[in-house]
Regions:
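Glycine-rich, small/polar surface segments that engage phosphate groups of diverse ligands
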Residues: 20, 24-85
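Active-site-proximal loop/helix of nucleotide/amide-processing enzymes and allied scaffolds
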Residues: 1-16, 25, 58, 72-155
């Protein structure tokens, strides 16, 4: 005989007051520039951080989450974790971003391969991957630069 635990969750929906809503929540993403601004907080980290922005059907931010903290030269994000969160928050699409502490935003071979896997997994789950941004700050010029897979036709 097996015991099965059941749990009942009750949700109440109400309109949020303006002071209760995080400024990032429901911000609409309409361009790569909007996306880059969303990932600026990970630019100066000394280690690679892989972050995901989860969006509703109108491209408004539902959630932003750091998924993986890597070493100085690599992040190995987990597809399952990315999409588990997307399903849990009912995201229609996602935008991924990570930093390159080296100051060079050009994607590595691993970045390109991972992006292909990410898009393929999103297609299977009907969660669109809109972009994968690599952001970095040039240590000599102190300029922030980025690489957008969507802008470069890599999606």
């Amino acid at each position: 005989m097996k015991m099965i635990r059941e749990m009942k969750i009750k949700y109440t929906v109400r309109e949020a007051k303006p002071e209760e809503v995080d400024a990032e929540y429901l911000k609409k993403i309409t361009s790569s520039d909007d996306t880059v601004k969303t990932f600026l907080d990970i630019t100066d980290s000394g280690i690679e951080l892989f972050s995901v922005v989860y969006l509703d059907s109108r491209n408004r931010i539902i959630l932003k989450q750091i998924i993986e903290k890597g070493t100085v030269n690599q992040a190995s994000p987990i597809l399952r974790e990315i999409f588990k969160i997307a399903i849990a928050c009912d995201a229609s699409s996602i935008i991924c971003g990570h930093n390159h502490p080296s100051g060079n935003p050009e994607p590595s071979r691993e970045d390109k391969e991972f992006t292909k896997e990410l898009v393929k997994a999103g297609e299977i789950l009907h969660i669109k991957v809109l972009d994968h941004i690599i952001i970095s700050r040039d240590l000599e010029t102190d300029r922030t630069s980025y690489y957008s897979f969507a802008d470069k036709g890599g999606m």
